[in-house]
């Protein structure tokens, strides 16, 4: 039976000094010997998805204390990708994921904590904490801050639901007046919480449910609803129970690596494909699996993507549907329920809250349960009042959305598409693969042949798009923006949004060794591996080259003969694999260190030593 890790610093005569310091934090005689639970918070006033978390850590701590544990809270950093977008701040976003993972490891191991509650929410925070949980392999429960309510704007006689991406698109569209743009800006992000569509933050919080590491509703109930408070209270109580099961009953089945097995990672990816989640989830699941020493690769993702239908379309794929609508339809447990009925899920895996995923679905899938409390939970609706306060309203929808033929969540027979929401493409530009969010691609351009317009940075591409230099039929190629080449693998939300603004969303493609925001849609292909900075063929593309994209057949190729490519490669080897044009980009020592040790997107951009 394993000893509590915390005994290292709380027991023995030679730990008198450490106990003295613990006492200075408020611990009493009776606390020594109880499990010490790290409350890993990520409160910051910089990020709307985290601005409401300040008091929630102490709420969880009180539940831990009441359940017989000792709670100790600390914070991680949190970068807002939307605020960091479109300038050099985005270079720091992906590297912050690894910094968060390291900081959690440092704090938990330095202080010998026994278990964790991870209070996350936005883009890199949930993945960073997930990587740490896999690395540490101590009992953990994830609970996130929850989605923002969708914005509402009265526009030209109609009211429509909007989000951050809508504000970005209209801002670059000259057909909108300044007053209309301001109305979108003021209405797009009305409350605290992670941006309201199926963007990266919400995608990852949904995937923690599929991995079995969070409670039902974690990915879908809005941040403002009083019922979300129940998740935080339950997390504090549950983590003490899990800690005691492991340390006092020798039950290792509740450890993260025992729950998040390869089958669980496949379930999570299956969910992501079915709901058209962010392409960034590919990076993060690969990275978390690497930390857990699980053999989960791009080949697994490719295999799954060929068999899983699209059962749910949410903004940006379907602009009038947001996370609040997914929750009304039964949330993630109901999407998983439909996948189970389609025999696309492994339900023997375990969770932190039920013995098996099958048990969880029997209790929480609104199609199979008859529990009135579950129905009421999923009727939790947005409040419609701008606020930065968590749990500040208790409005309810009058009915649930249980329509599986035409509703927000579909069954397999009535799927939005039989082909999945994400696809892995291979070809001579991407020998190790690349990713496209097919749920956001118009059917008319699933096959696309176009001529290359090559840019050595995101900034140069944006300038060309806004300068009306990009025409229908072009393939915008943005390179040297990968994990090493950026460094930091910037998101390309501005270029994709501006292509929409210019009316080119269905007439152009954008390919890059960088990545895309969960808010991106259109024929946007990212994560091209190997990247240009590693000698990838994307570094050999020239203006005017023909590029052939064939999503149904999972391919993307540069239509240039092998002899020409070999000659270009020889010339590039002599010059060095770096941008042709000098970029006005300050790369700090911190970013240089990241670039030295990161791997390709195909491996999750994890570190190598």
Swiss-Prot record:
Phylogenetic placement of the source organism: Bacteria, Pseudomonadati, Pseudomonadota, Gammaproteobacteria, Moraxellales
Cited function: Functions in the biosynthesis of branched-chain amino acids. Catalyzes the dehydration of (2R,3R)-2,3-dihydroxy-3-methylpentanoate (2,3-dihydroxy-3-methylvalerate) into 2-oxo-3-methylpentanoate (2-oxo-3-methylvalerate) and of (2R)-2,3-dihydroxy-3-methylbutanoate (2,3-dihydroxyisovalerate) into 2-oxo-3-methylbutanoate (2-oxoisovalerate), the penultimate precursor to L-isoleucine and L-valine, respectively.
Residues annotated as binding Mg(2+): 81, 123-124, 491
Chemical reaction(s) catalysed: (2R)-2,3-dihydroxy-3-methylbutanoate = 3-methyl-2-oxobutanoate + H2O; (2R,3R)-2,3-dihydroxy-3-methylpentanoate = (S)-3-methyl-2-oxopentanoate + H2O
Entry note: cofactor: Binds 1 [2Fe-2S] cluster per subunit. This cluster acts as a Lewis acid cofactor.
Taxonomy, superkingdom: Bacteria
The UniProt record lists the keyword Iron: yes
GO molecular function list: 2 iron, 2 sulfur cluster binding; dihydroxy-acid dehydratase activity; magnesium ion binding
Cofactor: [2Fe-2S] cluster; Mg(2+)
EC nos: 4.2.1.9
Family: Belongs to the IlvD/Edd family.
Alphabetical UniProt keywords: 2Fe-2S, Amino-acid biosynthesis, Branched-chain amino acid biosynthesis, Iron, Iron-sulfur, Lyase, Magnesium, Metal-binding
The organism of origin for this protein: Acinetobacter baylyi (strain ATCC 33305 / BD413 / ADP1)
Residue positions binding [2Fe-2S] cluster: 122, 195
Oligomeric and partner information: Homodimer.
The protein's name in its UniProt record: Dihydroxy-acid dehydratase 1
Pathway annotation from the record: Amino-acid biosynthesis; L-isoleucine biosynthesis; L-isoleucine from 2-oxobutanoate: step 3/4; Amino-acid biosynthesis; L-valine biosynthesis; L-valine from pyruvate: step 3/4
Pfam families for this protein: ILV_EDD_C, ILVD_EDD_N
UniProt GO cellular component terms: cytosol
């Amino acid at each position: 039976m394993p000893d509590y890790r915390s005994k290292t610093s709380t027991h023995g005569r030679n730990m008198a000094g450490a106990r003295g310091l613990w006492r200075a934090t408020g611990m009493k005689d009776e606390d020594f010997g109880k499990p010490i639970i790290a409350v890993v918070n990520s409160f910051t006033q910089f990020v709307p998805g985290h601005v409401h978390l300040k008091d929630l850590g102490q709420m969880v701590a009180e539940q831990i204390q009441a359940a017989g544990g000792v709670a100790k809270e600390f914070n991680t950093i949190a970068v807002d990708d939307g605020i960091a977008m479109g300038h050099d701040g985005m270079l720091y976003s992906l590297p912050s994921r690894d910094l968060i993972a390291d900081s959690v490891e440092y704090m938990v191991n330095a202080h010998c904590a026994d278990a964790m509650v991870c209070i996350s929410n936005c883009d890199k925070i949930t993945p960073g904490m997930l990587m740490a949980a896999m690395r540490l392999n101590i009992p953990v429960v994830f609970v996130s801050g929850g989605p923002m309510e969708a914005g509402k704007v009265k526009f030209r006689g109609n009211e429509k639901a909007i989000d951050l991406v809508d504000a970005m698109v209209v801002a670059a569209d000259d057909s909108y007046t300044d007053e209309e743009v301001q109305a979108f800006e003021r209405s797009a992000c009305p409350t605290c919480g992670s941006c309201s569509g199926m963007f990266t933050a919400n995608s990852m919080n949904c995937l923690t449910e599929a991995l079995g590491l969070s409670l039902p509703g974690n990915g879908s109930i809005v941040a403002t609803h009083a019922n979300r408070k129940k998740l935080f209270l339950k997390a504090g109580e549950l983590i003490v129970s899990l800690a005691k099961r492991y340390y006092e009953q020798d039950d290792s089945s509740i450890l993260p690596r025992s729950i998040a097995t390869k089958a669980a990672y496949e379930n999570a990816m299956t969910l992501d494909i079915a709901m058209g989640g962010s392409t960034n989830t590919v990076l993060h699941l690969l990275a978390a699996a690497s930390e857990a020493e699980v053999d989960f690769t791009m080949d697994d993702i490719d295999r799954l993507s060929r068999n899983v239908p699209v059962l749910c379309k949410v903004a940006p794929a379907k602009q009038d549907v947001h996370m609040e609508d997914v929750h009304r339809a039964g949330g993630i447990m109901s999407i998983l329920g439909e996948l189970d009925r389609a025999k696309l899920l492994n339900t023997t895996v375990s969770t932190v809250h039920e013995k098996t995923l099958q048990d969880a679905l029997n209790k929480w899938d609104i199609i199979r349960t008859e529990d009135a409390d579950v129905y009421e939970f999923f009727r939790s609706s947005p409040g419609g009042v701008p606020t930065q306060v968590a749990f500040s309203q208790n409005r309810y929808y009058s009915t649930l959305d249980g329509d599986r033929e035409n509703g927000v969540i579909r069954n397999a027979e009535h799927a939005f598409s039989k082909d999945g929401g994400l696809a892995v493409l291979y070809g001579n530009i991407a020998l190790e693969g690349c990713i496209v969010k097919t749920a956001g691609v118009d059917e008319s351009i699933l096959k696309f042949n176009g001529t290359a317009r090559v840019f050595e940075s995101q900034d140069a591409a944006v300038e060309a798009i806004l300068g009306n230099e990009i025409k229908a039929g072009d393939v915008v190629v943005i390179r040297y923006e990968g994990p090493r080449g950026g460094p930091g693998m910037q998101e390309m939300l501005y270029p994709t949004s501006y292509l929409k603004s210019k009316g080119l969303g269905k007439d152009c493609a954008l390919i890059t060794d960088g990545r895309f925001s969960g808010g991106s849609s259109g024929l946007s292909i990212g994560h091209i591996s190997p990247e240009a900075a590693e000698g990838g063929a994307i570094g050999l593309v020239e203006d005017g080259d023909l590029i052939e994209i064939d999503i149904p057949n999972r391919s993307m190729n540069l239509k240039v003969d092998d002899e020409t490519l070999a000659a270009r490669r020889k010339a590039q080897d002599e010059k060095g694999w770096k941008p042709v044009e000098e970029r006005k980009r300050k790369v700090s020592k911190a970013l240089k260190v990241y670039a030295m040790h990161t791997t390709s997107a195909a491996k999750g951009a994890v570190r190598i030593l």
